[in-house]
Every structure is written in C-alpha cells, then in structure tokens.
Curated annotation (Swiss-Prot):
InterPro entries for this protein: Ribosomal_bL9, Ribosomal_bL9/RNase_H1_N, Ribosomal_bL9_bac/chp, Ribosomal_bL9_C, Ribosomal_bL9_C_sf, Ribosomal_bL9_N, Ribosomal_bL9_N_sf
Protein name in the entry: Large ribosomal subunit protein bL9
The family this protein is said to belong to: Belongs to the bacterial ribosomal protein bL9 family.
UniProt GO cellular component terms: ribonucleoprotein complex; ribosome
A molecular function GO annotation: rRNA binding
UniProt keyword Transmembrane helix present: no
GO biological process: translation
Function of the molecule: Binds to the 23S rRNA.
Organism whose genome encodes this protein: Herminiimonas arsenicoxydans
Highest taxon of the lineage: Bacteria
C-alpha cells in the first residue's frame, strides 16, 4: 500500500514522502496513529494544500521536544527496589517504571519513549538509558537504582 507520511517516521521517511509499506503496517499503525494517509490522488492534492501547516506543526513539536530535552539532559532519576545482599533486584526496573519516575519529577514522558536496548534493569547501581522525545531528539538519562534489603 502506498501512503503519504504526515510526519517523520523512523526508518521510513520524512513528512510528505510517498512510500510503499505493507498493508498491515499501514492499517494497524501508521493510519490510526495519524502518521500517514493512503496515497490517493485526492489525498495527495489535499496534502499539498495543507503541507505548510503540517510543516509548521512538525517544527513546533521539534522545538518543544528540544526544549524538554535540554531540561532533561543530565537528570538523574533515583528508583528504589527490593534487592538481595548481592545487589540483584527482586524483579526489575522497566521502561514503565522509569517513565513514572520521570513524570513524578515533572517531565511528560511515556513508557514508549524510554529506550532500553539491553532490556529491563536487574542490578542496583547507575545505569544510562535513552529517552526519545522526538524522532530527532534522543537524550541520555542516568538511572540510579537503590536496593532496599529485604
């Protein structure tokens, strides 16, 4: 299926590009998330009319994400979990836990924005995770896990 991208999509393209994607990806993700529209002749014509407005909205989102990124850069989040004597946690710290901790500190971060390529954190100490506020704005945050001995 051919779609027009309404915003920048990682590993796919930028705003306004017409790309060919699998039907399921378009129907189940891109179109419901309002990241793309079907590339019909009417939709292409309508997009060209609204292009400047969409580019302005995309620039505003990028500026807001960059401003939030500047505030969030260098932040340290402290999370306490029950742990054993050797420093291993009973359970783990996931991206949802980190998003909740950042939200408590006053940063609007969703769990999908927290990138943990090595998986959940299972050991006490300092860890660095990436937070993708925008496709172009990815910052690093230090997570300090403090063990509560059971």
């Amino acid at each position: 299926m051919q779609v027009i991208l309404l915003e920048k999509v990682v590993n796919l393209g930028n705003l306004g590009e017409i790309v060919k994607v699998k039907d399921g990806y378009a129907r189940n993700f891109l179109i419901p998330q309002r990241k793309a529209r079907r590339a019909t002749t009417a939709a292409v014509a309508e997009f060209e009319v609204k292009r400047a407005e969409l580019e302005k909205i995309a620039a505003e989102k990028l500026a807001a994400s960059q401003a939030q990124g500047e505030k969030l850069t260098g932040q340290t989040v402290q999370i306490s979990q029950k742990s054993g004597v050797d420093g291993r946690l009973f359970g783990s710290v996931t991206n949802a836990d980190i998003a909740v901790a950042l939200t408590k500190q006053g940063f609007a971060v969703e769990k999908a924005q927290v990138r943990m390529p090595t998986g959940p954190l299972k050991v006490t100490g300092d860890h660095t995770v990436a937070v993708a506020l925008h496709t172009d704005v990815v910052i690093e945050v230090t997570i300090t896990i403090v063990g509560e001995h059971a």
